[in-house]
Amino acid sequence: MSLPIFNFTKIESTNDFARSLITEHKIFKGIIIADEQTKGRGRYGNQWSSPKGNLYFTIFFPILRSNLKKIQFLVQLQIRNILKSYNIKNVSLKWPNDLYVNNKKVSGILQESIVFGKLFLIVGIGINVKSSPKIKKYPTT
């Protein structure tokens, strides 16, 4: 499957941009990549710190409702496998959307779906590569 790619130096949110591509521009599949997000978010609208030097991207496409739950776990497994392929050890999964290395969060996945004529899946992924912001109370980004 060939997907259009949208690259940004800075964007508010890759997931929000995917939603606008679907609903406003009638583009129904693609990949959005950003060097930095100014309004990145996780589950429940929690802020996802998105400074330069890390990976932020969203993949969006039409999907059957019966496949929705499978995708989240498959994405987690693939990210874990990629990290392990770089000889990163002690990678663990925290259902439903986080990956940890040495008990510190290094990746978050935000899966959203919308109906616009048919069902679309929007999967946002953030991976700390260069920086892992310090949060006083929780070891997350």
Model-identified regions with their sequence ranges:
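N-terminal lobe of the biotin/lipoate ligase/transferase fold
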Residues: 1-85, 89, 107
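Short, glycine/acidic-enriched loop or turn micro-motifs at the edges of active sites
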Residues: 12, 38-39, 101, 127-129
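Short, acidic (Asp/Glu-rich) active-site segment that either coordinates a divalent metal cofactor
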Residues: 118-141
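Glycine-rich, flexible loop/turn motifs
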Residues: 44, 51, 96, 131, ...
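Acidic (Asp/Glu) carboxylate-rich active-site/surface patches
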Residues: 81-117, 126
